[in-house]
Amino acid sequence: MKILVSNDDGVLAPGIKILANELSTLGEVKVVAPDRNRSGASNSLTLTQPLRVKQLDNGYYSVDGTPTDCVHLALTGFLEPMADIVVSGINEGANLGDDVLYSGTVAAAMEGRYLGLPAIAISMVGDNIQHYETAAIIAKQLVIKLSANKLPSQTILNVNVPDLPLNQIRGLQVTRLGTRHSAEPIIKEYDPRGRPIYWVGPPGIEADAGAGTDFFAIKTGHVSITPLHLDMTHYKLFDHLSNLLNEICIEN
């Protein structure tokens, strides 16, 4: 098996090394990841300048681009032969609910799926993460399962793991995305010359976090596994929207 590993925390982040080491027992692992932390990069591609790649002493490839750049680069000619699966992570921090819209970790997995491969995004939930090995072992088991049981097209798995020893994990739960309240206000500060600068505020607190959500699974000590679909079309709105549009008169 050939496994492509990427992330958004950067090629030197602890999570990616632990993940790659664990997956190496399944086959050939190639790591292609950003040269620095690119959290929040979402699905952005670098289109206005070339990408530069450096191979590190450990064999990992460091790219001066986004997580999506890394996977796109790896799967469209940089790496031969083609990988069999993409695993993105292990992210230092949650990717729950609305987080998936901004997450570079999830975006890297999405890019793999766009390019035809099964893909998993995996994140640790907590501060000052201590138990990356837990997520790595779970990722390995999921890769084994997906190698024998293919996901439907345009589907990835978004996996969130509590920062606990493996023997304290209460099980795996299939979940839906919860939601957060709106983000906190921006944080205004001043640079040494007295000019205003702005930081994006913290994410909003949980809004929809009841039973069945990814938030709830984590709170109860479970691993959350959310199947995400890349087709964002809202099919149930077709009839209602068509009726609204029929009321619009467009004259030449």
Curated annotation (Swiss-Prot):
It catalyses: a ribonucleoside 5'-phosphate + H2O = a ribonucleoside + phosphate. Binds 1 divalent metal cation per subunit. The keyword Zinc does not apply. Gene3D superfamilies: Survival protein SurE-like phosphatase/nucleotidase. GO terms for molecular function: 3'-nucleotidase activity; 5'-nucleotidase activity; exopolyphosphatase activity; metal ion binding; nucleotide binding. Keywords: Cytoplasm, Hydrolase, Metal-binding, Nucleotide-binding. GO terms for cellular component: cytoplasm. HAMAP family: SurE. Belongs to the SurE nucleotidase family. This is 5'-nucleotidase SurE.
